Amino acid sequence: YRIAFVSIREIRGQYKFVGIIPPLIIKFPTNNPYSFHMRAFKDLKIAVAGTGYVGLSIATLLSQHHDVTAVDVIPEKVDKINRRVSPIQDEYIEKYFAEKELRLTATLDGRAAYRDADFVVIAAPTNYDPVKNFFDTHHIEDVIDLVLEVNPDAVMVIKSTIPVGYTRSLYKKYALQFLLKPELKGKRFNLLFSPEFLRESKALYDNLYPSRIIVGYPKMIEGTEFDEENAAIKAIGNPEAEAYAETFARLLQEGAIKDDISTLFMGMKEAEAVKLFANTYLALRVSYFNELDTYAEVKGLDAQAIIEGIGLDPRIGTHYNNPSFGYGGYCLPKDS
């Protein structure tokens, strides 16, 4: 038996998971009986929570080869998807809806969709809250709560934009539920993170021709400040998480048109940081060329000539260098 040491304290009437100092000892058999038998790859069923640019593009991509159920709370969007009318502006989604035989259905009933899913892709909105100075992640946790209620064996993959460290923090948050709730006894918390790198109105295209695929799974991090998270991952994480990450990456590769896609597997926190710093750099690049354009205007210079001269340096390049009103969209302002 492998033994996980967990410390639980009552703080202000609530039980808190506080670390690895024992008084509670949970034993898990080493033959891994808590793993569930996922369907064969070709028969995998997938649910996608959210039908914005991220969710609908992923649902469309995966439904080329698998049964996919898209979940949303807006009846009009669900109706449009089922009639193969895209509720968002995206040329390739519209094209695939019109021309492809997609195994895609949409529903308002998340409970039913998640109950029979092998993978649940979470693409719920995470709007930035200026009052709390933080991402509003409650929609993600609402989905997780429902999945754990109806199908705790499902592998959940967060695709939403989230702060660095968020996915690991969920292992700590949900540790007590898995250790104490009878209905979760013997189950494991199957949660991954896979950042998206999509452009609005080109979301499906960017999934068909991805620059890279990254999937993060739970890994240990050295340092005493990570003891609680590490203990939670040891207690409720699944040793098969890396294999599930590889399966999810294979799903994305299967749906893509591009061959030989660079695919990376790393810790969840590192995967979150990739998304953050990629978007921060893109926002910085837009701001840089806008500042250059402003300087040129004040000094009476030809901005395009300067930009062309700079861009011919291969370390800088000629892409993403058009001065404009600034950067926007759903992700760049949140990440920068």
Locate each region found by the language model:
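Short, low-complexity, charge-dense intrinsically disordered segments
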Residues: 1-12, 18-35
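Structural/interface elements that position substrates and couple domains in central-metabolism enzymes
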Residues: 34-336
